[in-house]
Amino acid sequence: MTNVITRFAPSPTGFLHIGSARTALFNYLFARHNNGKFLLRIEDTDKERSTKAAVDAIFSGLKWLGLDWDAEVIFQSKRNDLYKKAALRLLKEGKAYYCFTSQEEIEKQRQKALENKQHFIFNSEWRDKEPDAYPTDVKPVIRLKTPREGRITIHDTLQGEVVIENSHIDDMVLLRADGTATYMLAVVADDHDMGITHIIRGDDHLTNAARQIAIYQALGYEVPSMTHIPLIHGADGAKLSKRHGALGVDAYKNMGYLPESLCNYLLRLGWSHGNDEIISMTQAIEWFNLDSLGKSPSRLDFAKMNSLNAYYLRMLDNDTLTAKTVEILKQNYKISDKEVSYIKQAMSSLLVRSETLLDLAQLAQIYLVDSPIVYNQDAKEIIENCNKDLIKQVTEGLNKIEKFDKESVQNKFKEIAAANDLKLSDIMKPVRALITGMDASPSVFAIAEILGKENILKRLETI
């Protein structure tokens, strides 16, 4: 295979979409597998919608996922001279023409076609006119003179051969009246200039492919290999939208997913390697190929994503987990060294009940002794309806324990339960709510051992 060069070319008009992140991942893996280059291009020709915040989100999202790009980032907004040069060459060679038709006139043609129930293809009266007929008071656009006869064949690695009749392709605008290039021309000029050998993108771009190939052919450029992958759908099979959940990579990061986990999950959305589910980035680079791509849309499955993330959480060492958990807690709390120590001691018990870093941080609040305890609604109701005298007995009983470890605490609870002819769970329910602020938590006995007598009694006495 020739030196492989792939590209990821997002438009900076919002967050880094989860589907776009998968496209970037596939391009990255294919380039790395073939010892090639993975390039990044920002398609910011839409000045009104493109923002610096969106560009920053793309950069930070890719870096967080570990998808490092080669060479400097290409910004289309800085390359209009390249596009203009290509358009003027086509004009000189008779493969493009100046068009003076207004948008109002085009819209009239469109409406007429609709009224006659005909497929609309714009036919410009300026296609074959001589320069002496050009008006002097109107700024023209430059349109491609698409061949009227013949057909364009898209040789797609995944979709197979897709044939489009030239008669179904309009004379697309290459250069607007203000001298700026359209998306279609910019993409082709950039891909050629950057030496792109393989285009891997969503199949929503398949309709663009034929039009872009028409420009490639007019310019005499070699058409890169094309692979159009099915989009990601929601769990209900519909096209992914906001109602299906978080869409941006930054949102998944904020929800407590690990980048290794998200990459693994996205990789398996539309690509497979036998029955392997857990695939490291090293393995992905070694195994990735276009032959193993699926032809059907993949469905976003949060349960599977959570399960995979839980696996990757358990692969981290205690110090790393503690550091990541504390980092999240510091967004809302001032954390002392003592509290960090408590969280570190408790990490194995917290991990059992967690699928994300956010889950860990939520449970770790139990150990923030220097901050007021936060009670969830269920815990509040349990405390409100509990036997206050029973809690007083528990407080007095725990205060008498000399060696305050989980075995001693558990034995004391059993003793109090027996004395009151109660089940152990009858006591533990309100005690858990008071100590943790939750109706479900890791073992209260283990929590008591870590926090110590003084902190436990302080929480029980708040009733």
UniProtKB/Swiss-Prot annotation:
Positions occupied by motif 'HIGH' region: 10-20
Motif 'KMSKS' region: where in chain: 239-243
Superkingdom per UniProt: Bacteria
Catalytic activity: tRNA(Glu) + L-glutamate + ATP = L-glutamyl-tRNA(Glu) + AMP + diphosphate
Entry-linked PANTHER family: GLUTAMATE--TRNA LIGASE, GLUTAMATE--TRNA LIGASE, MITOCHONDRIAL-RELATED
Subunit-structure text: Monomer.
Descriptive protein name: Glutamate--tRNA ligase 2
Species of provenance: Rickettsia akari (strain Hartford)
